[in-house]
Amino acid sequence: MNRLAGQILSIRTHQGTSLVECATAAGTLTSVVLDTPESAPWLAVGQKLSLLFKESEVWMLPGGARFIPHCLKGEVESIHEGELMARVACRTQAGRVTSLVDRTWLARLALTPGAEIDLGIHPAAVALQKEEP
């Protein structure tokens, strides 16, 4: 599980669902939350929190592509290949982000340690966890 520190920048709410935009040290990510500031008082601009997302929810494209919305810039730190899948650890300004990709996609990307990479995370895949004081 990936975990990045963040802070709520903005909240848009409609019919019990909120799009919560959060700043991290590596860029901005958005989360879909099935709650509102009225029903969950911790959903407030300025609230510090953790953004959580699974390794299988991280998309990768070569650095500079920026075709992915909700994208963080990173650098490949290490690649561990298995029979079917590969675990790619990337350094970002917000900390390490790990992606789990199939080996076919890894071969197409032709990644090596030190390569620049863009990392995308779909808003529905990002969970928010309030920081306790």
PLM region spans:
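Glycine/charge-rich catalytic "coupling/switch" loops of P-loop NTPases
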Residues: N2-A5, S10, T28-L29, T36-S78, ...
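Short, conserved beta-turn/loop elements at beta-strand boundaries and strand-helix junctions
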Residues: I11-T17, I79-M85
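A generic beta-sheet turn/junction motif
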Residues: Q15, T24-A26, F53, E83, ...
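Short, acidic/hydrophobic/Gly-rich beta-strand patch recurrent on exposed beta strands
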Residues: L19-A25, V32-V33, R87-Q93, L100
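Glycine- and charge-enriched low-complexity intrinsically disordered segments
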Residues: G82-V97, T112-A115
